[in-house]
């Protein structure tokens, strides 16, 4: 595909990288192009109300962030990450025949083509218990050009759905609640003994009671376990029953990305309803797995952006754009503060590399709405 690169002098590149937050909003929202078509009756289900997709066309939607996690999440995350690093062997061979194997990346990833922890992992004191503070964070994000944020928490990670409702009400920023079950280290003990049918029923109850707008982040922590496969199959079936879109967590992207997509497709999920997450951790100049995900119709989630891993991700994004996959990319930060950094830090680096505002608008505004919008199969239970 042509039209993504433009001549950029060194001085212009420096100026673009140095763009301030004030410049981020018009850069994302001023692109003049026809938006995507949505099915009749499609909504984006936020916690406080359902939105027509057109209502959120004025800014970016961040598809994977965190605004509520339990007080013990950091400790559990650190322990699970250490266990995964201890178990991971050498980097896996690429799944095709590109000349170089993928190397670890995405903010200090461990051997194995990525790790569970990433630059968006929480560290230090938990700031997620102050509604006013979090509301100010979202107001700042809105001023940076964010129209909507998807929270990737779950009951098993300590996500407080009422906290999110209060934050959305105070900030005026729509929050879409993800849900489901996270990954093996976080599963309730009864998951192992529950049947797949029982898990599907539990998921649908959760979607109704918590007013979910997506399933996610749904993860495999290291090698996909039997319980994780069962949960992924149940998520696929719950999607068929609800139409809610799905976004995933890949602990070792090179090993699990395509298997996750296989399981979901086998359960009846169309790939265009799925974002395979953390693929910035799979650093591969040939973007082999990334291209397969795109060709199959799913979205590649570069969702730990706005930090040190950007240097690895920008060339991969450029390769995917040049291959014609702009319609299959999603960007976010997977963070707990500073939610606008995808727009204010990462996008200027892409502009400096030659990406046009029209393409960035497609990715940040159109792709995310196309993925999030769904025609409900069940009535909204909570106003």
Predicted segments with their positions:
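N-terminal secretory signal peptides
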Residues: 1-9, 22
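Histidine/acidic-residue-rich catalytic or RNA/ligand-binding cores of hydrolases
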Residues: 71-75, 161, 256-262, 284-293, ...
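Metal-cofactor-binding active-site regions of metalloenzymes
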Residues: 89, 96, 116-121, 125-126, ...
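Active-site gating/metal-coordination segments in enzymes
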Residues: 166-170, 174-245, 299, 305-307
């Amino acid at each position: 595909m042509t039209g993504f690169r433009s001549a950029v002098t060194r001085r212009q590149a420096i100026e673009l990288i140095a763009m301030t937050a004030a410049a981020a909003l018009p850069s994302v929202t001023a692109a003049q192009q026809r938006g995507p078509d949505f099915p009749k009756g499609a909504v984006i289900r936020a916690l406080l109300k359902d939105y027509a997709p057109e209502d959120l066309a004025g800014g970016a939607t961040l598809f994977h962030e965190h605004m509520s996690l339990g007080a013990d999440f950091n400790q559990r995350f650190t322990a699970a990450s250490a266990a995964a690093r201890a178990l991971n062997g050498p980097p896996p061979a690429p799944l095709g025949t590109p000349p170089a194997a993928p190397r670890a990346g995405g903010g200090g990833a461990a051997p194995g083509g990525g790790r569970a922890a990433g630059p968006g992992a929480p560290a230090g004191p938990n700031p997620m218990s102050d509604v006013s503070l979090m509301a100010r964070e979202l107001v700042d994000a809105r001023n940076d050009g964010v129209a909507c944020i998807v929270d990737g928490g779950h009951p098993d990670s300590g996500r407080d759905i009422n906290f999110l409702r209060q934050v959305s009400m105070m900030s005026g920023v729509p929050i879409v609640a993800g849900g489901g079950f996270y990954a093996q280290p976080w599963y309730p003990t009864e998951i192992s003994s529950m049947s797949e049918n029982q898990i599907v029923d539990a998921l649908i109850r959760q979607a109704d009671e918590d007013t979910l707008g997506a399933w996610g982040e749904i993860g495999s922590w290291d090698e996909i376990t039997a319980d994780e496969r069962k949960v992924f199959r149940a998520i696929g079936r719950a999607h068929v029953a609800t139409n809610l879109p799905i976004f995933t967590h890949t602990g070792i992207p090179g090993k699990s990305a395509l298997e996750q997509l296989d399981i979901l497709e086998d359960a009846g999920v169309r790939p265009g309803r799925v974002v395979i997450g953390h693929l910035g951790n799979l650093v591969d100049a040939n973007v082999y797995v990334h291209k397969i995900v795109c060709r199959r119709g799913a979205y590649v989630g570069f969702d730990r952006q706005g930090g040190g891993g950007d240097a690895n991700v920008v060339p991969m994004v450029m390769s995917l754009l040049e291959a014609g996959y702009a319609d299959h990319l999603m960007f976010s930060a997977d963070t707990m503060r500073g939610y606008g950094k995808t727009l204010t830090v990462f996008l200027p680096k892409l502009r400096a590399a030659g990406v046009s505002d029209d393409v960035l608008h497609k990715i940040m505004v159109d792709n995310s709405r196309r993925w999030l919008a769904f025609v409900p199969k069940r009535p909204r239970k909570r106003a």
